Amino acid sequence: MHVSHLQLADYRSYEAAYLELEPGVSTFIGPNGQGKTNLVEAIGYVATHSSHRVAHDAPLVRRGAQRAVIRAAVVRHGQTALIELEINPGRANRARLNRSPNTRMRDVLGILHTVLFAPEDLALVKGDPGERRRFLDELLTARAPRYAGVRSDYERVLKQRNALLKSAAAQNLHHRGGRDLPTLDVWDEHLAQIGAELLAARLALVAELQPLAAKAYGELTATQDPISLRYRCSATDEELDTTNRPQLVEILRAALLRARPDELRRGVSLVGPHRDDLQLWLNDLPAKGYASQGESWSYALALRLAGFELLRADGDDPVLLLDDVFAELDAERRRRLASYVRTAEQVLVTAAVPDDVPQELSGARFRVTGGSVERER
Ligand SMILES: Nc1ncnc2c1ncn2[C@@H]1O[C@H](COP(=O)(O)OP(=O)(O)OP(=O)(O)O)[C@@H](O)[C@H]1O
């Protein structure tokens, strides 16, 4: 798939921007702070309905404006879908598909697939478990949009359950072991059921990612260093060896029972997919805390490339967004990454310095300065 047009109104530093894009490689060059990342962020937003840089939408709207609009034409298998997103911080965002006003946000999720590589990816390896959970969940949702619903159902259950636990903690109910809290039993069951669905999907995804990430890491670094992805579930100390949902429901139910006194004391949910982690191992050591800067960065790239391979195997190349990644790599790794990604249907690259972009990625070139984007001829 590829994006053939992008139009922005009041998005970040852009009052108005319009670009025509082609399949193949396009490079966006310009000095720091001119709006290169804002462009790829906007395309990523169309795919995931979130930004890789901020957790909330407010910074996406141009200072002084009320709302931002992103319009993107996405060409898939010869058909064009016109997606329009209106970002209204503090209020519901709105979507239109092919100009139809009767579109829900979730109707346009999963039309455009992107894989974004950015300096922030280092947090995949070095950051909190939430970064890795988000990586898995975004990939799940790209492959099967219904997981957006599963994730938001899970978030809702968690919020309700936490509110209940918080008020129980305030009333010191843990002294009675929570026996007279039938509503908590109901929320436990919801959490176990929906949590198991998410857990099963994540475990299956990790199993698929493992060989692809190992291959990508080997190719990027030209080493045989073994990497392994291990899903750590908060419900058990052992490594889970099943993706069977009824079994996972049982495991979560039992863990919730065990955790209840602690949860009532602390007033938060301590068990479930929101507390899990994807541990990344390199050479039989956890990458977090042991891997070098260069190894961590290659690991993060390998995870993104594995995601790319999975989406590609599902039948359509995602659009690759490479935001300022070459500056972080030595010449050899730049070349290796470039030859890996240049086979994708569309690759959009940003760089402050043209020389950072390997020759393998020559293509259309755009100059970005002060909120305007011009194609170089
Ligand atoms: N909501 C906003 N309203 C107005 N301007 C904004 C908004 N958000 C970001 N900006 C501006 O956008 C610019 C940053 O754009 P961007 O991150 O795309 O830069 P870049 O060209 O990728 O730079 P670098 O090469 O340093 O990564 C900054 O000048 C910032 O002040």
Curated annotation (Swiss-Prot):
Keywords of this entry: ATP-binding, Cytoplasm, DNA damage, DNA repair, DNA replication, DNA-binding, Nucleotide-binding, SOS response
Binding residues for ATP: 30-37
Pfam families documented for this protein: SMC_N
Main location: cytoplasm
One Gene Ontology term from the biological process aspect of the record: double-strand break repair
Classification via CDD domains: ABC_RecF
GO molecular function, one term: single-stranded DNA binding
Superkingdom of the source species: Bacteria
Subcellular compartments: Cytoplasm
Any single GO CC term annotated in Swiss-Prot or TrEMBL for this entry: cytoplasm
PANTHER family: DNA REPLICATION AND REPAIR PROTEIN RECF
Record function comment: The RecF protein is involved in DNA metabolism; it is required for DNA replication and normal SOS inducibility. RecF binds preferentially to single-stranded, linear DNA. It also seems to bind ATP.
Family: Belongs to the RecF family.
Classification via NCBIfam families: recf
Name of the protein in question: DNA replication and repair protein RecF
Naturally occurring in which organism (per UniProt): Thermobifida fusca (strain YX)
